[in-house]
């Protein structure tokens, strides 16, 4: 799975919009949406919120966790803890990117929020790299990585898979040295 596929999954997350149009309930395969009434909040998938915003049909309400004080607390906790802390959304990075790219005018203190989420991401990726380093140096057979998001797993997944394959090959060659040194006379 690549980053665009993770972003696609994130677009299914529900967000609140305040429409400026009227429309009865819309029946889709993935569920019913609406009804849409001017100035009345309604929950819709992120992909629809972005589409409506691009057509100037709504205002997007940022998620509750997308607040400077809450994000500062999350960032500080992430820096304090040795383990990964739970994130406010399994798609926090993707939601932030999409909302700030398409609806920054609807998000108070958008630049600060962008910086705080990036700081949190950088801290978590640094922890992930340290975990991978100690995993490889300790010649571990398994690892427990709780509270990672799909994008974080996607970022480090290929490296971990390749590392495990190389470690397996090295271990098997060390356990059977005579098999690797056979020569025909």
Curated annotation (Swiss-Prot):
InterPro entries in the record: GINS_A, GINS_bundle-like_dom_sf, GINS_Psf2, PSF2_N
Compartment list: Nucleus; Chromosome
Biological processes, Gene Ontology terms: DNA replication; DNA strand elongation involved in DNA replication; double-strand break repair via break-induced replication; regulation of DNA-templated transcription elongation
One of the record's GO cellular component terms: nucleus
Any GO MF annotation of the entry: chromatin binding
Disulphide connectivity of cysteines: none
Domain of life: Eukaryota
Keywords: Chromosome, DNA replication, Nucleus
Protein role: Required for correct functioning of the GINS complex, a complex that plays an essential role in the initiation of DNA replication, and progression of DNA replication forks. GINS complex is a core component of CDC45-MCM-GINS (CMG) helicase, the molecular machine that unwinds template DNA during replication, and around which the replisome is built.
Homology family: Belongs to the GINS2/PSF2 family.
Oligomer status and interactors: Component of the GINS complex which is a heterotetramer of gins1/psf1, gins2/psf2, gins3/psf3 and gins4/sld5. Component of the CMG helicase complex, composed of the mcm2-7 complex, the GINS complex and cdc45.
Protein name in the entry: DNA replication complex GINS protein PSF2
Recorded name of the encoding gene: gins2
